[in-house]
């Protein structure tokens, strides 16, 4: 089953993306480089809980 997650910027800007992931095939926390429009550069986004 796919679960909704939040990817939060490690730049400290407070920007985040929401996405889904399959927890059965990828049980570890996701880390991906994406564009942060507040910092205006690519930064590392880390998975956090979606409240």
From Swiss-Prot:
This is Large ribosomal subunit protein bL33. Belongs to the bacterial ribosomal protein bL33 family. GO terms for cellular component: cytosolic large ribosomal subunit. HAMAP family: Ribosomal_bL33. InterPro entries: Ribosomal_bL33 (IPR001705), Ribosomal_bL33_CS (IPR018264), Ribosomal_bL33_sf (IPR038584), Ribosomal_zn-bd (IPR011332). It comes from the Bacteria. SUPFAM superfamilies: Zn-binding ribosomal proteins. PANTHER family: 54S RIBOSOMAL PROTEIN L39, MITOCHONDRIAL, LARGE RIBOSOMAL SUBUNIT PROTEIN BL33M. One of its GO terms (biological process) is translation. Residues 1-23 are annotated as: Disordered. GO terms for molecular function: structural constituent of ribosome. The keyword Ribonucleoprotein applies. Residues 10-20 have a biased composition (Polar residues). Keywords: Ribonucleoprotein, Ribosomal protein. Pfam families: Ribosomal_L33. The keyword Ribonucleoprotein applies.
């Amino acid at each position: 089953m796919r679960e909704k997650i939040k990817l939060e910027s490690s730049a400290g800007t407070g920007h985040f993306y929401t996405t889904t992931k399959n927890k059965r095939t990828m049980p570890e926390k996701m880390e991906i480089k994406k564009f942060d429009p507040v910092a205006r550069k690519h930064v590392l986004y880390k998975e956090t809980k979606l409240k």
